């Protein structure tokens, strides 16, 4: 019934298994990949006919995690998976980016790649397994895909690279880098690093490329046994129409691309396009070329004109040379009520970035396959259509916005202070108000400035720059701070973010083969120079975090209490902590480790709550005098609340220097008194004394009373701590009666 084909290999100390022929057999291609005990199913289905009227590849990638893969039931009311999580969106993009350039030019059939996580061992992240499985399924499917690709994760531990580190090892690594590519070339890099050098980052890319070669070879072996017949598809021949368009448009396109203002340039290019369509597709008479072909060829002509001009003259669309960064204006404190804000403008790209500080209650609760956890740093990127002078859909963030936000998040996170030093939840929102290339890197720069404006003590400021590449044969040009047009028409989009000490994030998307290690090395070095320049421009606005938090930001005080005292602070049914919150107005969060975070915009409220909690958990010191209140009177003494919530007994013999016949003759309930803490007996009962304290001045009278007894020739009395707590013995009987009983009368 099943024609199962398998390939197995040991990869990174674990077994990788690729299997086809048993599951999802009606798909054009399907592969079940297992790495360790993490298993994913990848399927590929392509439409039978091309979609009409489009000039792009209609590829959709959906990565989905199932809760059962980790033996869990989804949360929420419906108890089933809903809209894609952030991770699912990011991994979908991670799969899409390296495979998209490998489809044969002109393929217009709907193509859908669906990757489902079936099992997760909580050690091997499914993203790498998903990329490998998707590559294998595409290779088997028969669609015109010039793969396969391989993918690997690279860590950097103890000064060495680690292939496919476990989830626990990633937490200890100074690098988390994912690289994908073919046998000959790197196509995609996504990474987060803790201020590593350019050489270490490039070494990691090449290490990953080298070590995923066995995976590519295994996919090829599987394809030799199980691949379907290639689709009957002939790439369209456009040489004649491209030549015709270039003949009509080249001169005017060169002039149009000399306009440095984006909107003027776009208008001029649109005018040339309309002229070309009118010339080659006349309304009357025979049309040699269809309007769709002419428009597609016009895009190619645009690319050639821009690329030739850069390679021939070294001059770019806006007149800059290849290394110059656009003019930068940095401003901070631009919003009066925000905790921190900045307006970062680089040429025609502008980001309004706002930082907000919150408490532990504001942390994001994330329900992932690995379990639930909280995230204290959030970065949200918004790209409204007005930023490019257009109308468009508004609503929930799309994949691009989520991806760009995560890139900026990765760039900033390594320089944030640890939670124990800065116990705030941090949210950064980047509103892209203008865009002409590199808006995600503008978000990094603006985010760094807004955080420092809010008083967040970053280790160092970070900046980001987007690099591009034009490659024609042996000639190439690396471009610093690319425009949107240079991004679309170039061969590489290469984003680098970091501090003056090193790289914190690197993202690379390469559209063609032939980009060598040497070219990448040049690009990284040029990016380092550009990043240093941008950091210098940012320093004109702010060089480090402000010494104080923003005026409207909450203040948080952190204290550590013994874990066995947590229940005392919370109280029965939360009674004590609710009382503290209600009476002080502060927010209080207690962690299982005994860390207590007290938050309020009012410093007095924080101090009151802090002192209250301290009084509950602290232990009184023997011999110290405290203010107290009589809370209960008994025949044998009075109970005094003297140290926060602590009560102790003043025995009747410790109420006054003279003999006391009745407790109520000396003190009343509610009376304010001064007491000396004598200690606690072996049962933990607290003993206090009033008679050794001057109730007016609070002076300790112990030595004075001893001296008076010595003058009277009285023997020094023993400490009552040796006698234990005698308070429950009841009232004394008359001494005369006791003598009579003992004599037998």
UniProtKB/Swiss-Prot annotation:
Check the record and name the Gene3D superfamilies matching this protein: GHMP Kinase, N-terminal domain, K Homology domain, type 1, Nucleic acid-binding proteins
Q: Which UniProt keywords apply?
A: Cytoplasm, Magnesium, Metal-binding, Nucleotidyltransferase, RNA-binding, Transferase
Q: Which residues form the KH domain?
A: 554-613
Bias kind Basic and acidic residues: ranges: 701-745
State the InterPro entries in the record.
ExoRNase_PH_dom1 (IPR001247), ExoRNase_PH_dom2 (IPR015847), ExoRNase_PH_dom2_sf (IPR036345), KH_dom (IPR004087), KH_dom_type_1 (IPR004088), KH_dom_type_1_sf (IPR036612), NA-bd_OB-fold (IPR012340), PNPase (IPR012162)
Recorded hits in CDD domains, A to Z, give:
KH-I_PNPase, RNase_PH_PNPase_1, RNase_PH_PNPase_2, S1_PNPase
Cellular localization per UniProt = Cytoplasm
One of the record's GO molecular function terms: 3'-5'-RNA exonuclease activity
Q: Which domain of life is it from?
A: Bacteria
The reply to whether Cytoplasm figures as a keyword in the UniProt entry is yes
Q: Name one GO biological process term.
A: mRNA catabolic process
Catalytic function, reaction form = RNA(n+1) + phosphate = RNA(n) + a ribonucleoside 5'-diphosphate
Ranges for region Disordered: 695-745
Cofactors named for this entry: Mg(2+)
Briefly state the protein's biological role: Involved in mRNA degradation. Catalyzes the phosphorolysis of single-stranded polyribonucleotides processively in the 3'- to 5'-direction.
Record's PANTHER family?
Answer: POLYRIBONUCLEOTIDE NUCLEOTIDYLTRANSFERASE (PTHR11252), POLYRIBONUCLEOTIDE NUCLEOTIDYLTRANSFERASE 1, MITOCHONDRIAL (PTHR11252:SF0)
Protein name as it appears in the record = Polyribonucleotide nucleotidyltransferase
What's the source species for this entry? Methylorubrum extorquens (strain PA1)
């Amino acid at each position: 019934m099943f024609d199962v084909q398998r390939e197995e290999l040991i990869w990174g100390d674990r077994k990788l298994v690729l299997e086809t022929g048993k599951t999802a057999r009606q798909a054009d291609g399907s592969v079940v990949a297992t790495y360790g005990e993490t298993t994913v199913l990848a399927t590929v289905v392509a439409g039978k006919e091309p979609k009409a009227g489009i000039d792009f590849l209609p590829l959709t990638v959906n990565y989905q995690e199932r809760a059962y893969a980790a033996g869990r039931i989804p949360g929420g009311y419906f108890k089933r998976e809903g809209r894609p999580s952030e991770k699912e969106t990011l991994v979908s993009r991670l799969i899409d980016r390296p495979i998209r350039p490998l489809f044969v030019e002109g393929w217009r059939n709907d193509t859908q790649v669906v990757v489902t996580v079936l099992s997760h061992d909580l050690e091997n992240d499914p993203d790498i397994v998903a990329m490998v499985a998707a590559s294998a399924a595409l290779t088997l499917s028969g669609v015109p895909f010039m793969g396969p690709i391989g993918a690997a994760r690279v860590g950097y531990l103890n000064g060495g690279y680690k292939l496919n580190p476990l989830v626990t090892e990633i937490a200890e690594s100074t690098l988390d880098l994912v690289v994908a590519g073919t046998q000959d070339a790197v196509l995609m890099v996504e990474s987060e690093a803790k201020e590593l050098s350019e050489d270490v980052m490039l070494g990691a890319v090449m290490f990953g490329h080298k070590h995923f070669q066995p995976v590519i070879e295994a996919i090829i072996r599987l394809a030799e046994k199980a691949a379907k017949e290639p689709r009957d598809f002939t790439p369209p021949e456009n040489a004649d129409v491209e030549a015709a368009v270039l003949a009509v448009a080249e001169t005017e396109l060169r002039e149009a691309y000399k306009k440095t203002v984006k909107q003027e340039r776009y208008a001029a290019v649109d005018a040339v396009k309309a002229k070309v369509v009118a010339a080659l597709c006349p309304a009357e008479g025979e049309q040699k070329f269809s309007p769709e072909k002419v428009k597609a060829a016009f895009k190619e002509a645009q690319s050639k004109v821009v690329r030739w001009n850069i390679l021939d003259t070294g001059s770019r669309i806006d007149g800059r040379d290849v290394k110059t960064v656009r003019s930068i204006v940095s401003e901070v404190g631009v919003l009066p009520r925000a905790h921190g804000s900045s307006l970062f403008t680089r040429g025609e790209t502008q980001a309004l970035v706002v930082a907000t500080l919150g408490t532990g209650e504001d942390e994001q609760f994330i329900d992932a396959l690995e379990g639930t956890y909280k995230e204290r740093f959030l970065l949200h990127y918004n790209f409204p259509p007005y930023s490019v002078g257009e109308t468009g859909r508004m609503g929930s963030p799309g994949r691009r916005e989520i991806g760009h936000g995560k890139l900026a998040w990765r760039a900033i996170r390594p320089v944030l202070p640890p939670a124990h030093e800065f116990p705030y939840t941090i949210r950064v929102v980047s509103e892209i108000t203008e865009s002409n290339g590199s808006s995600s890197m503008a978000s990094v720069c603006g985010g760094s400035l807004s955080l420092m404006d809010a008083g967040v003590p970053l280790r160092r400021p970070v900046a980001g720059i987007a690099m591009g590449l034009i490659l024609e044969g042996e000639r190439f040009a690396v471009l610093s701070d690319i425009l949107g047009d240079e991004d679309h028409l170039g061969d590489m989009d290469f984003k680098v973010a970091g501090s003056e000490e090193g790289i914190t994030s690197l993202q690379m998307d390469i559209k063609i083969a032939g980009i060598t290690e040497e070219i990448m090395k040049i690009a990284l070095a040029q990016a380092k120079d550009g990043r240093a320049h941008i950091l210098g421009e940012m320093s004109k606005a702010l060089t480090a975090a402000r010494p104080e938090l923003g005026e409207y930001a909450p203040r948080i005080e952190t204290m550590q209490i013994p874990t066995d005292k947590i229940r005392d602070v919370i109280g029965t049914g939360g009674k004590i902590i609710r009382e503290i919150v209600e009476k002080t107005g502060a927010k209080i969060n207690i962690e299982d480790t005994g860390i207590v975070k007290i938050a309020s915009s009012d410093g007095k409220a924080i101090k009151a709550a802090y002192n209250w909690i301290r009084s509950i958990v602290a232990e009184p010191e023997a011999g110290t005098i405290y203010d107290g209140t009589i809370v209960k009177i008994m025949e044998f003494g009075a109970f005094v609340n003297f140290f926060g919530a602590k009560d102790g007994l003043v025995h009747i013999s410790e109420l006054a220097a003279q003999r006391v016949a009745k407790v109520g003759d000396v003190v009343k309930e509610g009376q304010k008194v001064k007491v000396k803490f004598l200690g606690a007996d072996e049962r933990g009962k607290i003993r206090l004394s009033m008679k050794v304290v001057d109730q007016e001045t609070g002076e300790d009278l112990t030595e004075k009373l001893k001296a008076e007894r010595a003058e009277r020739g009285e023997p020094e009395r023993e400490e009552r701590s040796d006698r234990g707590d005698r308070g429950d013995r009841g009232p004394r009987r008359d001494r005369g009666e006791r003598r009579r009983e003992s004599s037998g009368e």
